[in-house]
């Protein structure tokens, strides 16, 4: 019986994990790396980890405790970075662990985890840098554009020409183009794009140096109709998972027994019940959960 329950719990945990990574893909607006290119060389691997930390630093992620930062990569990313970091001077104990379990350990202050559920993002048909803004001085989460020359999919990352990100404390330009994520599919010929975060050039929540100019070019991360794996690095405050204890049914109307267990904030309810009509003894497991991107600016996608 315990083996059956463990198998069912594993299936549920996998689905929670998959939904969490998909939530991260759709809500994270920072993205670096070259989609389709794995960091298989030493130079590319170092650039990947350094670039991730740079973007998190620019976004104001805490630096005092680097154990707050994690990186979740798919199997190909794990394998390529293991290959790319061969020959670097490292703590012998870390190298021993890598050799023993085939998993990269803690590269450049990032707590690493391999996950087969890392999401695959597919861009729409819009050509990378041919669409433009229609009208200067725009702000907010909906940007008016000239009729799109193709589709743009939800989760796609974009930039606007000459619109840089700012340090969240000093409001000084980081020198890096501000990135945004498209929050709803946009059809071919559409004249607006929904984005996150809201474009805010002034005030307490300023996140860009300026609004895009009229006819500013919109550049899409990746290529038209291209797909990439959305490996994700994040500070521990970027995302949250909530699980809620559920109602315990009375032992009647077929319910034989119930149990609910919580550990580290994870709650599972097990219900055992009998179907008298069909003479079948059943057992089900339930979880009630939800993911949220609390501070998505403290996350970055590394596309491969």
Short names for language-model regions:
Residues 3, 7-62, 76-80, 122-147, ...:
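Alpha-helical scaffold segments that mediate packing/assembly in large oligomeric complexes
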Residues 8, 70-71, 158:
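Short hydrophobic/aromatic-rich beta-strand motifs
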Residues 73-75, 197, 285-287:
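Pocket-edge structural micro-motifs
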Residues 79-198, 202, 301-302:
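Autoprocessing Asn-cyclization modules and mimics
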Residues 87-124, 200, 211-304:
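Protruding loop/beta-arch "assembly-hinge" segments enriched in small, turn-prone residues
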């Amino acid at each position: 019986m315990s083996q059956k329950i463990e198998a069912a719990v594993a299936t549920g945990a996998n689905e929670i994990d998959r939904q969490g990574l998909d939530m991260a893909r759709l809500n994270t607006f920072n993205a670096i790396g070259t989609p389709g290119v794995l960091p298989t060389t030493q130079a590319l691997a170092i650039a990947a980890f350094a670039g991730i930390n740079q973007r998190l630093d620019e976004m104001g992620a805490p630096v005092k405790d680097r154990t707050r930062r994690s990186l979740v990569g798919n199997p190909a990313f794990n394998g390529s970075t293991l290959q790319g970091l061969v020959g670097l001077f490292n703590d012998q104990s870390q190298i021993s662990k890598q050799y023993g379990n085939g998993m990269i350990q803690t590269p450049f202050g990032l707590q690493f985890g391999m996950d087969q559920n890392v999401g695959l993002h597919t861009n729409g048909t819009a050509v990378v840098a041919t669409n433009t803004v229609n009208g200067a001085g725009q702000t907010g989460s909906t940007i008016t554009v000239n009729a799109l020359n193709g589709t743009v999919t939800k989760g796609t990352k974009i930039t606007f020409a000459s619109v840089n990100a700012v340090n969240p404390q000093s409001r000084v330009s980081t020198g890096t183009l501000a990135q945004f994520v498209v929050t709803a599919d946009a059809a071919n010929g559409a004249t607006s794009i929904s984005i996150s975060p809201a474009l805010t050039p002034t005030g307490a929540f300023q996140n860009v140096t300026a609004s895009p100019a009229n006819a500013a070019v919109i550049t899409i991360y990746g290529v038209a109709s291209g797909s990439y794996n959305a490996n994700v690095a994040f500070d521990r405050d970027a995302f949250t998972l909530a699980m809620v204890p559920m109602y315990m049914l009375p032992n009647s109307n077929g319910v034989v027994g119930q149990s609910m267990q919580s550990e580290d904030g994870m709650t599972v309810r097990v219900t055992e019940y009998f179907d008298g009509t069909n003479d079948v003894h059943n057992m089900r497991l339930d979880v009630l959960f939800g993911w949220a991107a609390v501070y998505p600016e403290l996350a970055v996608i590394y596309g491969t």
